[in-house]
């Protein structure tokens, strides 16, 4: 109703940008006539104008003025370098990003190209632009591919990848535009704040950031803290015993019924009952699980969580004797990530694999707080509108929906609901068969590894050839290959949460990727050095058509052959000969089996892109790549038209996800760029969402209507109640994230203060004066501890005051209580200030006699050492406070306010401890070679 009265607010936003689009289009002809050199010289012109800006606001003003011309220049550079012209809607996207907003653009609308516009414009300031993607592969692809536009226009482009040295990182962060991943960026920030000398710091101050797949990073990952940790010793046998005991404890079926513990799936939490505590204590032979000397409660609670809430092949998989977490949103494995607080060890004990050491947090930050460090932040995604409130409240980011370049022809069918899971899976298999027989490609999204394998077995039973894409290592290897062929006529692909974001499904098959695979097949065995590799790549022969294709461990020799049915045709003889020639040239240049696998992969990737190269091997491969692609295109082109005629890609959802956004991402795979397509969701009352949030009502309805087991119901009311359930879940998770954010905000303010202090020390401001102030404050605190101005002077404990001062500063050994007897409180303070300064001068001369400037180094070293050590302890104390603070709610107190107050007091105490410890350490410092006479003074 409001929309009808006031008009669509999104349309109003877009309308505001329209005059700028017109202006850019009017500039197009003039800019087309410029030579490459003239185009490049525009960059220097813009930079000169920006150099005149005196502050951030003036800089932003100039950027607004040059935006139309800068965008027109990027558009022209895109045509010259990439052969791609920015559509008008992509220009709109670029403006939204430059404004520090989120641009919602549908899958296949060229988000990657859009990012070049604001990246170039903001890169002109020389302050650095970070373009953030979700994985290393996409960061590298974009830096090589889109980076050409920026390099052509004279801006420097950097790339940050896992495993890079600090020197390389520093060089790449110093570029005008840097492509990286969210985790590399966050961990570099934390490492920079643990650096001991300025030379170790790799990042510059933050300026502007564009996040690709912004919803996945700012919402799905928001509660995941980035943690740098160090090991601590905990006895592993406790985890093993706790796992044994958890097996014997029984879950409570109904509230207040018999049982040792209750499980709250909604909160993902477990609570032990009184019987449970008694039973666990009996089994362990202890009197109290919370005994300070021998605590067990934490271990038992984690063991129950591992048993009930962490499910194998859903939340994690076991790979080579390790527990590897599976991302619940993308279905990808997250190697190297571990659950904290002993939970990972509990899962290791449950599965009987080796238990790894528990760790202690050295530095941590959540993505929420990390990205708020940027003065200007923006992002792109296909799905953000459903989370608009959160993005605006937490990050102050507005969402603007960018219209599609071509009208969508996708058809979303109504959901169907079955009484039980078995009936649902049979119906899904039936629909796969129908589509397969019609020659339409099908993509089935499942929510876990386990479920994808259930469906795979059903399809095998019906003799339907299909590909399986889930977190299992054998399938991950072929992820891009499987997704690239998912658009072939009659192809059936089962994917866990559509893991392969970033790879488009092209109707009729992806001839680019087929050509890459063919080159790989010929080049890899000849050029890659042999590895003693157990996880070998072995693909089934044609005889095993109906088995899900994957990867078989145990073969020593890698097999680079892709399954033959991937290629639509045999290569013509002359093309095959050209390929053999190119391979021979590569071997002659580099030597047989002489390069690491990744290097050869990279050569093939660059050959298939348009990036300029002076490597003769890549040039040769590029020529042959074009020939192979052309041979395949003749077939995939025909197949594309056939698939379009039959209705395009059919997407099947097998469960509503907790978030509507993830469902929309799956739907968005069909009907890209104006292609036809359809989507259909199959659900059952046993699905998690319905079970946890409101399935009873629907079950009651079905019973009332006497619905058969395998009879689906399809109704608008049902779809609405499902969306209601999803909204409930979204609100529930939003509240959880908001709570994390509010609590983390307390930590964040402290983190900013401590990191700013640390950076000041690192940059070597006058540390001597700082240490002297520390010493004076410490003396003041000692005076106040032993002297009460309210009491008469004869009751002051001057003996203790002096001995305490000497404990901190041994060079005050000559002072006695008599020296301060007649003084007022203030005079005592002033006297001690003076004595401490004198003592410090003596200390400095002693230390510097060993090596000139040694005292300055010692000051820096001790301040940093104390900050790091006490901050580490403070993080643990704050974590413990946060865990226990919830109980204050029972005493009618607001836990958050209590947490803020106590956290602040603990922070102040930590700062006092840092001061005192630095003073003590510096005066105690005895560098080697110090004259003996001094040592004897102690």
From Swiss-Prot:
One of the record's GO molecular function terms: ATP binding
E.C. code: 7.4.2.8
Annotated keywords: ATP-binding, Cell inner membrane, Cell membrane, Cytoplasm, Membrane, Nucleotide-binding, Protein transport, Thylakoid, Translocase, Translocation, Transport
Full protein name: Protein translocase subunit SecA
Entry superkingdom: Bacteria
EC primary class: translocase
One Gene Ontology term from the biological process aspect of the record: intracellular protein transmembrane transport
UniProt-listed HAMAP family: SecA
Membrane topology field: Peripheral membrane protein
Cellular component, GO annotation: cell envelope Sec protein transport complex; cytosol; plasma membrane-derived thylakoid membrane
Pfam family name, one: SecA_SW
NCBIfam families: secA
Binding residues for ATP: 90, 108-112, 504
């Amino acid at each position: 109703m409001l929309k009808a009265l006031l008009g669509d607010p999104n349309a109003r936003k877009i309308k505001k940008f329209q005059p700028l689009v017109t202006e850019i289009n009017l500039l197009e002809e003039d800019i087309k006539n410029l030579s490459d050199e003239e185009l490049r010289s525009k960059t220097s012109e813009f930079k000169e104008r920006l150099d005149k800006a005196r502050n951030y606001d003036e800089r932003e003003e100039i950027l607004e003025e040059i935006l139309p011309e800068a965008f027109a220049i990027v558009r022209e550079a895109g045509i010259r370098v990439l052969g791609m012209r920015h559509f008008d809607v992509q220009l709109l996207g670029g403006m939204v990003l430059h404004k520090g907003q989120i641009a919602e653009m549908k899958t296949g609308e060229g988000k990657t190209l859009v990012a070049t516009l604001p990246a170039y414009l903001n890169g002109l300031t020389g302050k650095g632009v970070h373009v953030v993607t979700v994985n290393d592969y996409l960061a590298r692809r974009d830096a090589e591919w889109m980076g050409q536009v920026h390099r052509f226009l004279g801006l420097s482009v950097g790339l940050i990848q896992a495993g890079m040295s600090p020197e390389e990182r520093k060089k790449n962060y110093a570029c005008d535009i840097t492509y990286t991943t969210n985790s590399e960026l966050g961990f570099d920030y934390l490492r920079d704040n643990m650096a001991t000398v300025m030379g170790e710091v790799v990042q510059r101050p933050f300026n502007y950031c564009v996040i690709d797949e912004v919803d996945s990073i700012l919402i799905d990952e928001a509660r995941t803290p980035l943690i740098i940790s160090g090991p601590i010793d905990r006895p592993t046998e406790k985890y093993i015993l706790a796992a044994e005991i958890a097996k014997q404890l029984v879950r409570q079926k109904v509230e207040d019924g018999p049982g040792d513990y209750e499980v709250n799936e909604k909160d993902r939490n477990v609570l032990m009952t009184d019987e449970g505590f008694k039973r666990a204590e009996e089994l362990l032979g202890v009197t109290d699980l919370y005994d300070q000397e021998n605590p067990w409660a934490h271990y038992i609670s984690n063991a129950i969580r591992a048993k009930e809430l962490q499910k194998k092949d859903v939340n994690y998989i076991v790979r080579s004797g390790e527990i590897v977490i599976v991302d619940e949103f993308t279905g990808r494995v997250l190697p190297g990530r571990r659950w904290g607080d002993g939970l990972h060890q509990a899962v290791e004990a449950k599965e009987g694999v080796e238990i790894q050491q528990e760790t202690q947090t050295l530095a941590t930050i959540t993505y929420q707080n990390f990205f708020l460090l940027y003065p200007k932040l923006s992002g792109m995604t296909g799905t953000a509108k459903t989370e608009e409130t959160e993005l605006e409240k937490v990050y102050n980011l507005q969402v603007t929906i960018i219209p599609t370049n071509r009208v969508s022809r996708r058809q979303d069918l109504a959901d169907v609901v079955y009484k039980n899971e078995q009936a649902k899976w049979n119906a899904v298999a039936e629909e796969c068969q129908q589509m397969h027989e019609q020659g339409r490609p099908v993509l089935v999204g499942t929510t876990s590894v386990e479920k994808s394998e259930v469906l795979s077995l059903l399809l095998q039973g019906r003799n339907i050839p299909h590909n399986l894409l889930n977190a299992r290592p054998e399938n991950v290897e072929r992820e891009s290959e499987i997704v690239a062929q998912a658009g072939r006529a009659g192809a059936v692909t089962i994917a866990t949460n559509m893991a392969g974001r970033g790879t488009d499904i092209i109707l009729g098959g992806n001839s680019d990727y087929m050509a890459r695979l063919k080159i790989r097949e010929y080049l890899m065995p000849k050029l890659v050095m042999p590895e003693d590799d157990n996880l070998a790549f072995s693909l089934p022969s044609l005889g095993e058509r109906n088995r899900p294709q994957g990867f078989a461990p145990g073969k020593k020799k890698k097999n680079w052959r892709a399954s033959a049915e991937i290629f639509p045709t045999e290569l013509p003889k002359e093309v095959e000969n050209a390929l053999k020639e190119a391979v021979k040239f590569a071997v002659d240049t580099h030597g047989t089996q002489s390069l690491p696998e990744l290097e050869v992969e990279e050569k093939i990737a660059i050959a298939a892109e348009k990036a300029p190269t002076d490597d003769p091997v890549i040039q040769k491969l590029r020529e042959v790549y074009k020939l192979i692609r052309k041979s395949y295109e003749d077939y995939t082109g025909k197949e594309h038209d056939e698939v379009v005629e039959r209705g395009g890609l059919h997407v099947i959802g097998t469960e509503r996800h907790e978030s509507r956004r993830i469902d929309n991402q799956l739907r968005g795979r069909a009907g890209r760029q104006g292609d036809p397509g359809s989507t259909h969701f199959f659900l059952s009352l046993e699905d998690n969402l319905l079970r946890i949030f409101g399935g009873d009502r629907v079950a009651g309805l079905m019973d009332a209507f006497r619905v058969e087991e395998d009879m689906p119901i399809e109704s608008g009311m049902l779809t609405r109640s499902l969306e209601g359930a999803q909204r409930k879940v979204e609100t529930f998770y939003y509240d959880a994230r908001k709570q994390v954010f509010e609590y983390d905000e307390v930590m964040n303010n402290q983190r900013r203060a401590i990191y700013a202090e640390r950076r000041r020390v690192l940059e070597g401001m006058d540390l001597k004066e700082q240490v002297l102030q520390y010493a004076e404050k410490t003396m003041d605190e000692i005076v106040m501890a032993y002297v009460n101005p309210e009491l008469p002077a004869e009751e002051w404990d001057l003996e203790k005051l002096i001995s305490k001062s000497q404990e901190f500063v041994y060079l005050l050994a000559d002072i006695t209580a008599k020296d301060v007897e007649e003084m007022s409180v203030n005079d005592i303070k002033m006297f001690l200030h003076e004595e401490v300064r004198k003592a410090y001068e003596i200390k400095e001369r002693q230390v510097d006699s060993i090596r000139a400037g040694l005292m300055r180094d010692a000051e820096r070293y001790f301040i940093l050492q104390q900050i790091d050590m006490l901050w580490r302890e403070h993080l643990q104390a704050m974590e413990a406070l946060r865990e226990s603070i919830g109980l204050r709610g029972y005493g009618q107190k607001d836990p958050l306010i209590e947490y803020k107050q106590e956290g602040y007091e603990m922070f102040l105490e930590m700062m006092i401890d840092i001061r005192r410890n630095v003073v003590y350490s510096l005066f105690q410092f005895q560098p080697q070679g110090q004259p003996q006479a001094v040592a004897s003074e102690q």
